[in-house]
Amino acid sequence: MKNYSSLIIGGKKFSSRLMVGTGKYKSSQDMVESLSNSETEIITVAVRRIKNEQSGENLLEKINWEKYWMLPNTAGCVNSDEAVRIAILGRELAKLSGQEENNFVKLEVIPDKKYLLPDPIETLKAAEILIKKGFAVLPYINADPILAKRLEEIGCATVMPLGSPIGSGQGLLNLSNIRIIIENAKVPVIIDAGIGVPSEASQAMEIGADGVLINSAIAQAANPPLMAQAINYSVKAGRQAFLAGRIKKQDFAVASSPEKNISI
């Protein structure tokens, strides 16, 4: 049974339901301000891109790791063997940052360079190996209810179906499948990829997602810190709306004023 009062992943409790990525920012200052404005507690770090090749900056030195929980990801991996190797490196990075107990990994296995769609077979294979190695696995997948359930059954800490392709800003294109995943899951469902604006983040939360992970929508906005703040508000509003319960849709109008006992 899901816990609706707080977000619990791998036995760790979080108050924020917004996860934020650290890539694509125009400057490290934009990134730091955006992270602060988002009020996130979990930030993703691409292990293979920890050092900015253009500026030479190291993410580990720019972020206060006492404030944020590191979620190393295996971006750039094209098969399960690569993903396992990078995940192990990511766990060591977390330890170097002072998070000795951090065994989280965002599992990405993406051989498709054009559409950046995850490989379901290699993802499942890597997840099985990593779980045996003691990782809390957060797998990035297509909106496939059967795969999501299988990953849950083998012990993944969450499932992370995409809303639409990475960085596309197309929003939630497969709502029916995402709804099925949410309905059937006993682990947190985090919508990852494709969200472009706050209203889409709110929509994900309104249908019952446990959280969202957002990078491009913030990092590539004209004003990233302001967008981070807007998305933070939208995630909170969407969650409250889900808990409050929306009205039933009708095929006809329903008067809001009483039709009986009218005094005038």
Swiss-Prot record:
It is found in: Cytoplasm. The lineage of its organism: Bacteria, Bacillati, Cyanobacteriota, Cyanophyceae, Synechococcales. Belongs to the ThiG family. Keywords: Cytoplasm, Schiff base, Thiamine biosynthesis, Transferase. One of its GO terms (biological process) is thiamine diphosphate biosynthetic process. Its EC number is 2.8.1.10. One of its GO terms (molecular function) is thiazole synthase activity. Pathway: Cofactor biosynthesis; thiamine diphosphate biosynthesis. Its main location: cytoplasm. It catalyses: [ThiS sulfur-carrier protein]-C-terminal-Gly-aminoethanethioate + 2-iminoacetate + 1-deoxy-D-xylulose 5-phosphate = [ThiS sulfur-carrier protein]-C-terminal Gly-Gly + 2-[(2R,5Z)-2-carboxy-4-methylthiazol-5(2H)-ylidene]ethyl phosphate + 2 H2O + H(+). GO terms for cellular component: cytoplasm. Catalyzes the rearrangement of 1-deoxy-D-xylulose 5-phosphate (DXP) to produce the thiazole phosphate moiety of thiamine. Sulfur is provided by the thiocarboxylate moiety of the carrier protein ThiS. In vitro, sulfur can be provided by H(2)S. The keyword Cytoplasm applies. The gene is thiG. The keyword Disulfide bond does not apply. Homotetramer. Forms heterodimers with either ThiH or ThiS. 1-deoxy-D-xylulose 5-phosphate binds at G167, A193, G194, N215, S216. It comes from the Bacteria. InterPro entries: Aldolase_TIM, Thiazole_synthase_ThiG, ThiG. Pfam families: ThiG (PF05690). This is Thiazole synthase. The active site is at K106 (schiff-base intermediate with dxp). It comes from Prochlorococcus marinus (strain MIT 9301).
